[in-house]
Amino acid sequence: MRTIKPLLTTVSIVAAGLTLAACGGGSTSAGDSSLSGQVGIDGSSTVFPLTALAAEDFQTVNSGVQVKVGSSGTGGGFEKFCRGESDANDASRPIKDDEAAACASAGVAYGPLTVAVDALTIVVSKDNTWATCLTTDQLGAIWAPGSTVANWNEIDPSFPAEPIKLFGPGTDSGTFDYFTGVINGEEGASRTDYTPSEDDNVIVQGVSGSKGGLGYFGFTYYEENADKLTAVQIDSGSGCVAPSAATAQDGTYAPLSRPLFVYPSIAALARPEVAAFFQYYVDNDASIAEGAQYIPLNEAQRTTLKADFAALLAQASTAPSPIAS
């Protein structure tokens, strides 16, 4: 499978128009050489490789539209999006109330599209031979605000007295919000004495370079670095379950399986080049997800995606046509 190197924070990809079917969907086709302009997308580092690959594939059959995909974190991306600085925002969690209010105040209308499923993955170094499975309570004990857990044997007396070195996403990350919400019971509630980064490769390097390292990020980053890291099985009360496409889809990898989103602006979708890109993204969602080593939607979820996009296109068809970026 093809992979996108998530070390990059901005990708500029030349892509262009497809002949867009009437509102409601339809097939895409190449060859509309009159299509031009730019599409700007920012947001989640977790969703970044997926959208970047969609843009890359769009380029192979079209030319003339520049698609720029950035990676400033879900929260940082929503700040830009609600200021009108991007056409869409990648997100690893739903938009928050304060973000929705900011968009509403700025007159930015949008809609969420679920483009893939993720298994938020807890990782340790290859030198860690003891933490093969952790309970959600143990994770909470490690990551809770004010936690003083410093060594592995404080989590389980059978573990060695090895210092725990923690790595994770920064506070602008949707992954941080999701993890803290399901593990600590409140979004943003976390101990602060860890190494944060919006670049998941920094987390990979930190955990893999420390015998007692522990971190978390999206499943695709684990798959790309499985030679350096070990994925920890999670026990939420029904036994140890490893992260995988199957366990994320069937819900057994609870509570760390989650949907991944792209939020396009309704006004941006009124521009032909933006609508064409997202039509391509939706129509080819399964192959894009598989190509980027993500967990694709099941048939029911894919049907919902197409219906959601058709509804957004219908709204865009009545929106004032903005000036192309």
Predicted regions: what is each one?
Residues 1-11:
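Bacterial N-terminal signal peptides that target proteins for export
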Residues 17-22:
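C-terminal motif of bacterial Sec signal peptides marking the signal peptidase cleavage site
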Residues 23-325:
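Flexible loop/hinge segments at secondary-structure junctions
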